[in-house]
């Protein structure tokens, strides 16, 4: 997969979850083809995180473990790179798309393409922000044992090109990764 991912790139779902999202997009487009007065906006969210998110996802999962003096567990070698987008920025883009006719019948990437980070650096950043530096270290699960993930389906690099959303919605990332992680830690509520 080439990065950054553009809206026009060929999509390749590797999981049921990914394929179901792509099928939903096609269903919406087919509906609009059938009923011309129907307008849509498809927003592709890239790695949204924020306060109150369950510990199923990487950022709250790492914080949840570190706050309990447990090492964050990294599946794979830790070189996997993502770019994370704070929930308030995602929500703002969603509302903007709802009220902008410029977004009609468009597919837009919503994410943070300016701060890609690998999982080792993300784990160490969270350890530092939780005040556990030099006390807790990431644990590696290189063979993906006891996880819902598979090495063969792992995507090593994934972040998006948001230039179309920037042009159409005046979209911009307002919350940098470090600040967003601090906000999640401050809420101190991560459901299991």
Identify the residue ranges that each predicted region occupies.
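Conserved SDR Rossmann-fold cofactor-binding beta-strand/turn motif
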Residues: 44-49
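Catalytic helix-loop patch of NAD(P)-dependent Rossmann-fold dehydrogenases
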Residues: 1-42, 53-55
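Active-site helix-initiating loop/hinge in glycosyltransferases
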Residues: 50, 54, 83-86
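C-terminal substrate-binding subdomain of Rossmann-fold SDR/epimerase-dehydratase oxidoreductases
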Residues: 66-192
